[in-house]
């Protein structure tokens, strides 16, 4: 995440639960725990990651792994597996190959795509508590969003990787994500770009003006927070023993 989960402290609505699509190796787990969020649904398409994820989730009773690729329909697709793991995608490389010449697809594997709404209906009675959705699935984000209209009505926030060029062939662009999420009252309030044609965006339903100001001044806010962060670290590390 280009914007750390725990830098989202402006959030007026409490994050009760998270749906994280594109689990990979649970890199965001420590940040979620630090933010006191224990209810997390992880979705991952790559079967090679399942044993690692399940082993890591054993001590968390309120976290579960969904073993499928989030999409608009129940279908079978080929997942392209990359040599760095994180660039694996259901789509072929576009400008990604030019931007990251050392990254290649090394194999393919057949996976199922499912609409998130259908899977949640089959497996959860308390899906209303999952009001934060995080998507990082390498250009396939819009297809995944189209499979979760019911959950988007519930969500207060969507954090998503976005593209400004065809990083993956046929991938959704920022304007496409903006237009689609607007149907559910979700407006883009923050954006962080890289120089590689992609970035991260945060969408919210409430306090839009305040949220936009917050993200505009986030670099300054981080500097202001730094002494307090170091103070808390010192207290926890050396005093509370």
For each feature predicted by the language model, list its residue ranges.
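Phosphate/nucleotide-binding beta-alpha loop and adjacent structural elements of enzyme active sites
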Residues: 1-241
């Amino acid at each position: 995440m280009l914007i750390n989960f725990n830098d989202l402290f402006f959030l007026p609505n409490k994050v009760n639960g998270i749906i994280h699509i594109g689990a990979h190796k649970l890199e965001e787990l420590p940040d979620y725990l630090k933010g006191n969020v224990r209810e997390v649904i992880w979705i991952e398409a790559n079967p090679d990651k399942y044993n690692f994820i399940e082993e890591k989730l054993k001590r968390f009773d309120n976290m579960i792994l969904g073993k499928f690729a989030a999409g608009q329909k129940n279908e079978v697709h080929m997942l392209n597996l990359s040599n760095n793991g994180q660039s694996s995608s259901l789509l072929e490389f576009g400008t990604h190959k030019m931007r990251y010449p050392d990254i290649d697809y090394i194999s393919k594997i057949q996976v199922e795509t499912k609409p998130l709404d259908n899977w949640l209906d089959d497996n959860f009675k308390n899906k209303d508590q999952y009001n934060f959705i995080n998507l990082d699935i390498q250009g396939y984000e819009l297809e995944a969003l189209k499979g979760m209209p019911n959950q988007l009505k519930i969500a207060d926030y969507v954090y998503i990787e976005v593209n400004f060029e065809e990083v993956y062939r046929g991938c959704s662009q920022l304007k496409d994500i903006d237009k689609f999420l607007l149907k559910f009252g979700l407006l883009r309030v923050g954006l962080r770009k890289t120089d590689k044609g992609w970035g991260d965006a945060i969408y919210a339903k409430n306090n839009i003006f305040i949220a936009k100001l917050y993200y505009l001044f986030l670099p300054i806010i981080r500097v202001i927070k730094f002494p307090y962060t170091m103070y808390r670290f010192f207290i926890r590390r050396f005093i509370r023993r």
